[in-house]
Amino acid sequence: DKAADPIIVHPDVRRMLLTMKALNEGGRAFSSYVAMQLDTAKYSEDAVTRKRAEELVALLTPVAKAFLTDMGLETTIHGQQIFGGHGFIREWGQEQLVRDCRITQIYEGTNGIQALDLVGRKVIGSGGAFSRHFTNEIKAFVASADEALGEFSKPLAAAVENLEELTAWLLDRAKGNPNEIGAASVEYLHVFGYTAYAYMWALMARTALAKQGEDDFYASKLGTARFYFARLLPRIHSLSASVRAGSESLYLLDAEQF
C-alpha cells in the first residue's frame, strides 16, 4: 500500500542521469573553449597568439562537430531509457528528441569524415604540431595544480600522456600504411574528446573547489567532475586499445563476404 520509491534511488538511473549531466556540461564547456579560440584568432593583437588560436580551432573543430554529436545522441538515448516504455511513445516527446539528435551525426558531414579530417589533415598533416598546442596547454595546467586538485590533475596527466603516445604511434604507423588513418580515426577522435572533456572538468573542479560551501551549484559541479573522472574518462583505455589494434582486422573479409 505504500507509494513506490522514486526511480532516482536506483543506481542505474543515477548512472544515466550523471552521464547525461557530465557529458552535456562538459560539452558546453568545450564549446565555450573553442569559441574563445575563435575570438582569439580573430581579435588578438599578437600575431603568434592569433596563429596558435587558428591552429587550435582547426584541430578542435572536427572534435566539436563529431564528439559533441556522438555524446549528444548517447545522452538523449539515456533520457529515453530513464522514461522506460514512456520514452518510446510520442506523449512525452523524448522519441522525437532522439530523432533530432541522430541527424546531427550526419548533416555536418558524417562523423567518420570529421574523424578523418582530425587525424589525416589536422594531426598527421601538421606532423602533430596542432595537437601539441593542446596537450602542452593541458600539461601546463597540470603542472600548476595544487595538492587539492590532485584527484583531477593526476588522472588528467595520465590521460594526456596516453593521448600523446597514441598520437605518436599513429603518426609512425600511417607512414607505412595509409589505411591506418581511416581505421583509427573514429576511436582516436573519441580518445581526444574524452581527454578534452577531462581538461574542461578539471578546470571546472578548480573553480568549484575554491568556492565549495558557498553554493550547491559548486557542490554539484564537483560531484559531477568526480563522476566523470571515475566512470567516463576510463573509456579511453578500451578506445586506445582499438586504435592500436590497427587496420588488419578490417580487411579480413572480401567485399562479397559482407
Q: For each predicted feature, which ranges?
A:
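C-terminal helix-coil-helix/basic helical segment that borders enzyme active sites and/or dimer interfaces
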Residues: 25-64, 168-183, 204-219
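Alpha-helix capping/hinge segments and adjacent helical runs
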Residues: 33, 55-133, 223, 227-253
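Secondary-structure transition/capping motifs at alpha-helix termini
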Residues: 23-29, 37-51, 74, 78-90, ...
